[in-house]
Amino acid sequence: MGPRRRSRKPEAPRRRSPSPTPTPGPSRRGPSLGASSHQHSRRRQGWLKEIRKLQKSTHLLIRKLPFSRLAREICVKFTRGVDFNWQAQALLALQEAAEAFLVHLFEDAYLLTLHAGRVTLFPKDVQLARRIRGLEEGLG
């Protein structure tokens, strides 16, 4: 058996001398406030990076084959079943125009979102943007 511990008599609590520079110890409550905000900003930077990357790019965002099928389907619908042959350059020009229209529409709708004091884009913002644009701007 090891040495026995002596029982101590109750004493007055000892006073600790104040240390000149407190050293931060490990926290038992979880990560500190700074660490959680760092993780939050790192998570937020992911979608911000994606937005900035897409804003800098000039490539088409809608895939060519699904857009081509949609354009042909709409053409067949409005020509009463007559199927036209499409040149690749014609489909590409149509896709460029469609994407430019959508980008401009969403830019206007997001400005309306900010004007309303929100961050989330709602369908009513897109509807109001189309209504403000009128027939000349492609309301249709």
From Swiss-Prot:
Annotated region (CATD), positions in chain: 75-116
The organism's superkingdom is given as Eukaryota
User: What GO molecular function annotation could you give as one example from this UniProt entry?
Assistant: chromatin binding
Keywords associated with the record: ADP-ribosylation, Cell cycle, Cell division, Centromere, Chromosome, DNA-binding, Host-virus interaction, Methylation, Mitosis, Nucleosome core, Nucleus, Phosphoprotein, Ubl conjugation
Cite the residue spans of the region called Important for flexibility of DNA ends that protrude from nucleosomes. Answer: 39-54
Q: Which Pfam families match?
A: Histone
Instruction: Say if the entry is tagged with keyword Cell division.
Output: yes
Q: Residues where Phosphoserine occurs?
A: S7, S17, S19, S27, S68
A GO cellular-component term linked to this record:
pericentric heterochromatin
- Where are the compositionally biased (Low complexity) regions? 26-37
Chief place of localization: nucleus
Q: Which SUPFAM superfamilies match?
A: Histone-fold (SSF47113)
Further comment: Antibodies against CENPA are present in sera from patients with autoimmune diseases that developed autoantibodies against centrosomal proteins.
Which family does the similarity line name?
Answer: Belongs to the histone H3 family.
Q: What is this protein called?
A: Histone H3-like centromeric protein A
Q: Which organism is it from?
A: Homo sapiens
Source lineage? Eukaryota, Metazoa, Chordata, Craniata, Vertebrata
